[in-house]
From Swiss-Prot:
Official protein name in the record: Protein PB1-F2
Sites marked High pathogenicity: S66
One Pfam family hit: PB1-F2
Protein function: Plays an important role in promoting lung pathology in both primary viral infection and secondary bacterial infection. Promotes alteration of mitochondrial morphology, dissipation of mitochondrial membrane potential, and cell death. Alternatively, inhibits the production of interferon in the infected cell at the level of host mitochondrial antiviral signaling MAVS. Its level of expression differs greatly depending on which cell type is infected, in a manner that is independent of the levels of expression of other viral proteins. Monocytic cells are more affected than epithelial cells.
UniProt-listed InterPro entries: Flu_proapoptotic_PB1-F2 (IPR021045)
Subunit composition and interactions: Oligomer. Interacts with human SLC25A6/ANT3 and VDAC1. Interacts with host MAVS.
Positions of region (Disordered): 1-29
Keywords annotated in UniProt: Apoptosis, Host cytoplasm, Host membrane, Host mitochondrion, Host mitochondrion inner membrane, Host nucleus, Host-virus interaction, Inhibition of host innate immune response by virus, Inhibition of host MAVS by virus, Inhibition of host RLR pathway by virus, Membrane, Modulation of host cell apoptosis by virus, Viral immunoevasion
One GO biological process term: symbiont-mediated suppression of host cytoplasmic pattern recognition receptor signaling pathway via inhibition of MAVS activity
Keyword Membrane appears in the UniProt entry: yes
Region (Mitochondrial targeting sequence): 65-87
Amino acid sequence: MEQEQDTPWTQSTEHINIQKRGNGKQTQKLEHPNLTQLMDHCLRIMSQVDMHKQIVSWKQWLSLKSPTQESLKTRVLKRWKSFNKQEWTS
């Protein structure tokens, strides 16, 4: 079997303990030592997807060629840059 790339998902799902009881039956116990990592990973991915959607919509809006929007473009770009700085520092 090929070794999968180690991700929080595979790490958490691979932690299955098979224990034998006194009567010979096997029980499986699923442990989640990396559940926090998995949740962090999911939140990070969701945040990146959200950020990508925002960037695409802003770029589409900014690509409009109406001359009356030049001042708005400047204002939005300034806000976008400050928003971006806040995102990277948090």
